[in-house]
Curated annotation (Swiss-Prot):
NCBIfam families registered for this protein in UniProt: PRK11300.1
Topological category with respect to the lipid bilayer: Peripheral membrane protein
Domain named ABC transporter: residues: 6-254
Protein's UniProt name: High-affinity branched-chain amino acid transport ATP-binding protein BraF
Superkingdom per UniProt: Bacteria
Positions that bind ATP: 38-45
Family classification: Belongs to the ABC transporter superfamily.
CDD domains (UniProt xref): ABC_Mj1267_LivG_branched (cd03219)
Any matching Pfam family: BCA_ABC_TP_C
Biological role: Component of the high affinity leucine, isoleucine, valine, transport system (LIV-I), which is operative without Na(+) and is specific for alanine and threonine, in addition to branched-chain amino acids.
GO BP, sorted A to Z: D-alanine transmembrane transport; L-alanine transport; L-isoleucine import across plasma membrane; L-valine import across plasma membrane
Subcellular location: Cell inner membrane
Cysteine disulfide partners in this protein: none
Length: 255
């Protein structure tokens, strides 16, 4: 059996006297779609914040391809190929759609100050390649015709897709999506489902998803992890989770 691309053991996060995350375990295989579900306030986003370096976990291990990454700052984790979206759209609203993508591409540009100042052939070539890659991802998320529109003027579902495209500009190995279907209508949710499937099948991306839309979760996930009150409650296939009495109780309460 191959080693998981991401493995989390005993993840713990305290805020003073509050134990927000308590002993969460997670294994993600390459090219899987793994969903993390649970009632509001269960600690799911806190887990994401620990995995991506926004929080420094109090305890536990986070391994990416066997390398421990807990405690690393967010930008170093991103450079290792782990990127994320947030519950709230975080685009540069005054910039165009294509400019939002180019911002995410800066680390891959073969440029420096002098090259930019003198517009060297290497700089121009790097700039051209960045534009071509941005155009590619605008096409992948069906936003080509909106390339020069300000991001803030796009429909909400379009902004969500643009956020995912911006993540993909960094060539990630793991894409973490925090409630990407929140606020979407059924057609937009179907488009999101198709996009996630495409990222996995055509771009070899592993997806870790927080989502409350159970229809989407059950239809797209290979594996589901359930968290309740900061602690692991259950994990398994969609079929196993659907019929788990502890999961049903956590969502619906006891009769």
């Amino acid at each position: 059996m191959s080693r998981p691309i991401l493995e989390v053991s005993g993840l713990t996060m305290r805020f003073g006297g509050l134990l927000a995350v308590n002993g969460v375990n997670l294994k993600v295989e390459e090219k899987q779609v793994v969903s993390m579900i649970g009632p509001n306030g269960a600690g799911k986003t806190t887990v994401f914040n620990c995995l991506t370096g926004f929080y420094q976990p109090t305890g536990g291990l986070i391994r990416l391809d066997g390398e421990e990454i807990q405690g690393l700052p967010g930008h170093k984790i991103a450079r290792k190929g782990v990127v994320r979206t947030f519950q709230n759209v975080r685009l540069f609203k005054e910039m165009t759609a294509v400019e939002n993508l180019l911002v995410a591409q800066h680390r891959h540009l073969n440029t420096n100050f002098l090259a930019g100042l003198f517009k060297t052939p290497a700089f121009r070539r790097s700039e051209r390649e960045a534009m071509e890659y941005a155009a590619h991802w605008l096409e992948e998320v069906n936003l080509t015709e909106f390339a020069n529109r300000s991001a803030g003027t796009l429909a909400y579902g379009q902004q969500r897709r643009l956020e995912i495209a911006r993540c993909m500009m960094t060539r990630p190995r793991i894409l973490m999506l925090d409630e990407p279907a929140a606020g979407l209508n059924p057609k937009e949710t179907d488009d999101l489902k198709a996009l996630i499937a495409k990222l996995r099948s055509e771009h070899n991306v592993t997806v870790l998803l927080i989502e409350h839309d159970m229809k989407l979760v059950m239809s797209i996930s290979d594996h589901i992890v359930v968290i309740n009150q900061g602690a692991p409650l259950a994990d398994g296939t969609p079929e196993q989770i659907r019929d788990n009495p502890d999961v049903i109780k956590a969502y619906l309460g006891e009769a």
